A protein has these predicted regions:
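Bacterial N-terminal signal peptides that target proteins for export
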Residues: 2-12
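Bacterial N-terminal signal peptides
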Residues: 13-21
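N-terminal leader/linker segments that initiate helical-solenoid repeat arrays
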Residues: 24-59, 66-68
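Residue-level recognition of tetratricopeptide repeat
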Residues: 34, 62, 95-96, 129, ...
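Structural signature of tandem alpha-helical TPR/SEL1-like repeats
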Residues: 44, 67-76, 99-112, 134-146, ...
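Structural marker of alpha-solenoid helical repeat scaffolds
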Residues: 51-52, 82-83, 116, 150, ...
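Helix-start (N-cap) detector for alpha-helical repeat units in TPR-like alpha-solenoids
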Residues: 54-55, 87-88, 121-122, 137, ...
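Canonical tetratricopeptide repeat
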Residues: 59, 92-93, 126, 160, ...
Length: 202
């Protein structure tokens, strides 16, 4: 029994006290990938995510979709499907279905990803994306707000939550999430449009 073993046990004990699951601990990602994505530096985000963790690969796919490079986004999702983690494989499969404009199938698979790991914020985010594409705004709100709860620093979960709430005419919630988006992603390409919307609803 070494100091290292004692330290490992201490880390696990702290995680248990804080209520952190294995999924939450494993959800660490390259912070620069999310930062670049949220600032609109999409190609740089893709480059930074290269050979990275599943979350960074997922964000790289989202960056490529912003660039209208669905072919490369599919390639990133295919790479993600090689993950050892069942939830990530399902998130990737859902992403592929959504890129193919099969929103219903994408939503069904995203729900399976949530069943596999309900603590993965990107599973809920993917459900929100799929539900939004299907105009199922209630489910979209649920997906994005749960993603925000699990990963409060993910600006685009706030952004899409705001859009979904706007569709439901829940304007205070819309403003709340748009404000969070602007705070987390001050350089995002959507900044001007978001400020304009906020002026009309506040």
């Amino acid at each position: 029994m070494t100091t290292k073993c004692t330290l490992n046990r201490s880390i696990l004990a702290v995680a248990a006290v804080l209520g952190l699951s294995g999924s939450a601990l494993a959800a660490e990602q390259k912070p620069e990938v999310q930062r670049l994505f949220q600032s609109g530096s999409y190609e740089q985000a893709v480059e930074a995510a290269r050979d990275g963790d599943p979350a960074s690969t997922f964000i790289a796919a989202q960056a490529l979709l912003k660039l209208d490079r669905s072919d490369r986004a599919v390639a990133e999702m295919t790479r993600l499907r090689a993950s050892d983690n069942a939830a990530w494989r399902l998130i990737a499969e859902s992403g592929e279905a959504l890129i193919a404009d099969d929103a219903g199938r994408a939503a069904d698979i995203a729900r399976r990803a949530i069943e596999a790991d309900g603590d993965n914020p990107f599973a809920h985010y993917q459900l929100g994306l799929a539900a939004g594409k299907a105009n199922d705004w209630g489910t979209a709100v649920e997906g994005f707000t749960r993603a925000v709860e699990l990963k409060p620093d993910f600006a685009y979960a706030h952004y899409y939550a705001a859009l979904a709430y706007q569709r439901q005419r829940q304007l205070p919630k819309t403003a709340q999430h748009f404000d969070a988006f602007l705070r987390l992603a001050p350089d995002a390409p959507e900044r001007g449009a978001v400020i304009a919307i906020l002026r009309t609803i506040k």
